[in-house]
From Swiss-Prot:
Family: Belongs to the glycosyl hydrolase 43 family.
Any one of the GO BP annotations: arabinan catabolic process
Function: Endo-1,5-alpha-L-arabinanase involved in degradation of pectin. Its preferred substrate is linear 1,5-alpha-L-arabinan.
Lineage of origin: Eukaryota, Fungi, Dikarya, Ascomycota, Pezizomycotina
Active-site residues, Swiss-Prot/TrEMBL: 34, 198
Annotated organism of origin: Aspergillus oryzae (strain ATCC 42149 / RIB 40)
Site residues (Important for catalytic activity, responsible for pKa modulation of the active site Glu and correct orientation of both the proton donor and substrate), renumbered to this chain: 147
Signal peptide from the UniProt entry: 1-19
PANTHER family attached to this UniProt entry: ARABINAN ENDO-1,5-ALPHA-L-ARABINOSIDASE (PTHR43301), ARABINAN ENDO-1,5-ALPHA-L-ARABINOSIDASE A-RELATED (PTHR43301:SF3)
Protein name (record): Probable arabinan endo-1,5-alpha-L-arabinosidase A
One Pfam assignment: Glyco_hydro_43
Subcellular location, record wording: Secreted
Disulfide cysteine pairs (residue numbers): none
Molecular function terms, GO-annotated: arabinan endo-1,5-alpha-L-arabinosidase activity
Length: 319
């Protein structure tokens, strides 16, 4: 009894030290990069991800078992870009009666990029219509037009995007969320080092808009491991408006390096990122992401689907 109590106390203290719950269960097709999560009208979960011209899978539960279904754009993107046959970083949202999937085409590490849009009534394979590009960037721009996320807020549509350079920007979209109606505005910037901010996701909860983003080195951990603490992690800032003035929990502006850590490497979890937030009908707000399980391997192809319920009781998200 004493040994069991001591072990429980040790485990509790360990949990307090790192402060993060382990990822929720996943079975079936769990290898993934840059996930996007949604449910259809009958409650089936759909999960989209980078690779195979936007892979997608379905499951009856967020835990799985996940079944791979195919590709959203099996012939690649219609956008005239060198990355058209390798679209990445999907973001799926329901807009009216349609499912919208925003995606990126680019060459890694360049600004010759575009954010594209595909739509479907059902999300089934073969039903997606590619609408082409809605935001583009080129060498010399302040931003890189990849990693898009749509927030539908009443009658307004906000597209947040960006990666490195001047980091995260936002545009307002038209009523059917198919084209930009504004000039991109900077909403997050880390002035230090290489400005490693990307993968923004804007989520409204209560009276605040929470800007989640990935910070650090994302990929290639099997061949070149970054210095400790420089690997991917998930940060957040918040604002009372969706269009700017985001600050972290210490009051530091998100445009001046602010950002409160939500999830970082812990235990067997390494480099969590590529995140989104989904309002699950049973679990409430859920943070989902990809991560490396250090007991399995560090290659990009070995990254796994992770998720945790979010606690907003303090006014700031914690997992």
């Amino acid at each position: 009894m004493y040994l069991q109590s001591s072990l429980a106390l040790v485990l509790l203290r360990a949990a307090v030290v790192h402060g993060y719950a382990n990822p929720g269960a996943c079975s079936g097709a769990c290898n993934i990069h840059d996930p996007s999560l949604i449910q259809n009208g009958d409650g089936t979960y759909y999960r989209f991800s980078t690779g195979n011209n936007i892979s997608f899978a379905s499951a009856s539960s967020i835990e799985g078992p996940w079944t791979a279904l195919g590709s959203v754009l099996p012939g690649g993107s219609s956008i005239d870009n060198s990355g058209r046959y390798d679209p990445w970083a999907p973001d799926v949202q329901k807009v009216g009666d349609l499912y919208y999937l925003y995606y990126a085409v680019s060459s890694f590490g360049t600004q010759e990029s575009a954010i594209g849009l595909a739509t479907s009534e059902t999300m089934e394979e073969g039903t997606w219509t590619d609408k082409g590009s809605i935001v583009t960037s080129t060498t010399g721009d302040q931003y890189n037009a990849i990693d898009a996320n749509l927030l539908v807020d009443g009658s307004a549509n906000y597209l947040t995007f960006g990666s490195f350079w001047q980091d995260i920007f936002q545009v307002t979209l038209n009523g059917d969320a198919t084209s930009s109606t504004s000039t991109p505005v900077n909403v997050a910037f880390d002035p230090a080092t290489t400005h490693p901010v990307e993968g923004a996701y804007l989520y409204k909860y209560g009276d605040y808009y929470y800007l989640f983003y990935s910070w650090g080195t994302c990929c290639g951990y099997d061949t070149s491991r970054p210095a400790e603490g420089e690997e991917y992690k998930i940060k957040v800032c918040r604002s009372s408006t969706p269009t700017g003035n985001f600050v972290d929990a210490s009051g530091v502006a998100c445009t001046d390096g602010g950002g409160t850590v939500v999830l970082e490497s812990h235990d067997n979890v390494y480099g969590p990122g590529g995140q989104g937030v989904y309002t699950d009908p049973n679990l409430g707000p859920v943070l989902y992401y990809h991560y490396v399980d250090t007991t399995i391997g560090y290659a990009d192809s070995q990254k796994l689907f992770g998720w945790n319920a979010i606690d907003f009781s303090s006014g700031w998200p914690s997992v």
